[in-house]
Amino acid sequence: MAESNFVDYVKIYCRSGKGGRGSTHMRREKYCPNGGPDGGDGGRGGHIILRGNRNYWTLLHLKYDRHAMAGHGESGSKNRSFGKDGADKVIEVPCGTVVYNAETGEYLCDVTDDGQEVILLKGGRGGQGNSHFKTATRQAPRFAQPGEPMQEMTVIMELKLLADVGLVGFPNAGKSTLLSAISAAKPKIADYPFTTLEPNLGIVSYRDGKSFVMADIPGIIEGASQGKGLGLRFLRHIERNSLLLFMVPADSDDIRKEYEVLLNELRTFNPEMLDKQRVLAITKSDMLDQELMDEIEPTLPEGVPHIFISSVSGLGISVLKDILWEELNKESNKIEDIVHRPKDVTRLQQELKDMGEDEELDYEYEEDADDEDDDLDYEYEEEDWEEK
């Protein structure tokens, strides 16, 4: 079977650059034999930077590029010349990318906006040259400050799609059919469970040039929050939706029970999901007459806007758009920042195994050769970097 192009989970080894060393150069000129120290400062090591890019919507471009390394700062030189800063390594990621420490599960950062930049790992600061250490009693210091060490970390990048409306339902509930009917998205549609194996996004056009984004999430089954079916892999994409459209087919044995099972799966995965506004759509309603709709109406969940629709015949689609637009524009339904919690280490290891990301990514590298300007023997004098 062909490998999916939708990648929403990768593990990457990141390493910032180390700072360049300060120079110990002594000024030696024809008419200035005792010119004193003139060693320059070392350059800053390169940062590891994450940048949001709306042109990406998966992490596929990172799947086969698992090592991100910034350049080292160059050493200072004579005439108090600063060393060149190391090149930053910029990692382009889709908006909605969350980053965790792969070893501890600690939450690190969240990139949500196009062009947003986050420094994941800072490069080491350059060391001070010997010109900084000249004093009244120490006219020719033969030492300089070493550059600050680099930082390295293996991280997990996890994508949570940004959409206004998330479609929630069991397999074959008609989610993909609805998305294809009201947007230009063309998800695969077939009459068997789990036709949709990855999320699909569609832009739904509304009146007066207005629009909103809808996400078709692969079908949930009872026990998905414990890993059954497609498991919790795609449940995280619902976290960023400001409104959830629950879809239950009209031929379901018990519409209310099916809705409550879906609700319970979301509650188990993340209780905060229940704070989102919900709308219930009874799909495939072209098989119902008005009398049957009237009989079903009293059995539906209270306090949840509901509508009978058919994506094939167009029944209720226009009204559904009105309901969704109205709910989306309520102040209480604006997308809020997600509270990201650290991952449990034990569950993290199992998660990495399930996602096929349990391979070690440590990187072997060679130390740079010593490129000092002179051959003087000196000892580094460690400085308190925090007070520099």
Curated annotation (Swiss-Prot):
EC top class, as a word: hydrolase
Region of interest (Disordered), ranges: 352-388
Metal-binding among keywords: yes
Main location: cytoplasm
EC number annotated for this UniProt entry: 3.6.5.-
Listed cofactors: Mg(2+)
Biased composition (Acidic residues): 356-388
Compartment(s) where it occurs, according to its Swiss-Prot or TrEMBL record: Cytoplasm
PROSITE patterns: G_OBG (PS51710), GTP1_OBG (PS00905), OBG (PS51883)
PANTHER family: DEVELOPMENTALLY REGULATED GTP-BINDING PROTEIN-RELATED, MITOCHONDRIAL RIBOSOME-ASSOCIATED GTPASE 2
Protein name from the UniProt record: GTPase Obg
Natural source organism: Bacteroides thetaiotaomicron (strain ATCC 29148 / DSM 2079 / JCM 5827 / CCUG 10774 / NCTC 10582 / VPI-5482 / E50)
Gene that encodes the chain: obg
